[in-house]
Amino acid sequence: MARVTVEDAVEQIGNRFDMILVAARRARQIAVQGKDPMVEEMNDKPTVIALREIELGLVNAHTLDADERQTVREREAAEIAAVAAIAEGRSL
């Protein structure tokens, strides 16, 4: 697929504005946070990869929210373990 049409992604999300927000969040995850793409990269930029994932129904606002909640839970668990280790006087 050489080009991604925004219309295909809009159909998956429901409206153009929500699609833009979801695509931006997912592209940021791929570009900045180091998340792995769910589709083949094919030398595409993160925004195009995000649109392709949306078009295929792999990503939506709910999946991004769930992923973010899981990341927060993991980070909090690591912080709690670090505080417990410090309180017990042992190093990580």
Swiss-Prot record:
Record-level GO cellular component terms: cytosolic DNA-directed RNA polymerase complex
Keywords: DNA-directed RNA polymerase, Nucleotidyltransferase, Transcription, Transferase
SUPFAM superfamilies referenced in this protein's UniProt entry, alphabetically: RPB6/omega subunit-like (SSF63562)
The protein's Enzyme Commission number: 2.7.7.6
Domain of life: Bacteria
Any single biological process term in GO: DNA-templated transcription initiation
Function: Promotes RNA polymerase assembly. Latches the N- and C-terminal regions of the beta' subunit thereby facilitating its interaction with the beta and alpha subunits.
Subunit structure, as described in the record: The RNAP catalytic core consists of 2 alpha, 1 beta, 1 beta' and 1 omega subunit. When a sigma factor is associated with the core the holoenzyme is formed, which can initiate transcription.
UniProt-recorded name of the protein: DNA-directed RNA polymerase subunit omega
Gene name as annotated: rpoZ
